[in-house]
Amino acid sequence: MPKKKSLTTRRVLALFLTYITLCVAGGVVSSILFVPGVMSVNSVVKSVVPSLRVDGIDFDVTALPQKSRLYASDGKTVIATFYAQNRTVVPLRRISQYMQQAMVAREDRRFFEHSGVDVQGVMRAFVQTFIKKSDMQGGSSLTQQYVKNVLMIKAREDNDPISEYHAAESTVARKLREMLIAIQMEKKYSKLEILQGYLNVAQFGSNNLYGVETAAKRYFNTTAANLNLVQAATIASITKNPSRYDPSIEENQPESQKQRNIVLDLMLRQNFISQKEHDDAVTTPIKSTLNIQHEVANVGCQAAGDAAF
């Protein structure tokens, strides 16, 4: 019996080391050989599953699908607005500091320390998934989450359901691919550029609602630049489960307030806010903060009545 236990331990350790080695290898490949190294990995990946490639993908942090507006002959009156994803892209300077801090606190507290992959997060996810045998855990850095979102957008634009499936599936292969690309991204873009990209690409509610500018308008009738602490924490809390935590749905509001307060707790723990700011914010009923703009949630075509025709 002791011998069998020892063997199991060695196997678990070997699996753990293999997993971490692959993560680190991605970093070494990217930092030393960069594109040639990634291409060599990519050729192996594509031979197994073609849609799991890591090359030839545009990750421009500003090139995201936005709304298109149809104007009347006067060039000013908006007749209709068309979109696949309800999003308005804004630069980081037009996103409040509270919103930036809330997002980092919620999604990746070591964002400004790692190089694209949060090794501690990966180790925690490994233990939960492979040793404790729980569901596949996250462990993804904010950069990796940005990569995942862009891969899904790219697949939809290309009308490629296979690539879209692989971009979202809960597998180690997908995680490793995201790690490789995330490390590449952090060589090309600054942390602030990546944070800007994520704040514009992430889903912040049901009804195809993406990006903090649209979320600010939808929930509070304001702009991303003017979001206060409570509003920012509310929006940051949504990304974990956009349908369940969407505060515009009345039955979601108790859970939405709970999730908002979790974000506020994290912001306090990470020294983004003071104890007084935290205490004042967590006692604020979420319903009293909302100013829902229902027209912002229209999906696919936001039209000006009969004028659209």
What do these predicted ranges mean?
Residues 48-49, 156-167, 295-309:
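Charged, glycine/proline-rich intrinsically disordered loops and linkers
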Residues 64-274:
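Peptidoglycan glycan-strand catalytic modules in the bacterial/periplasmic cell-wall system
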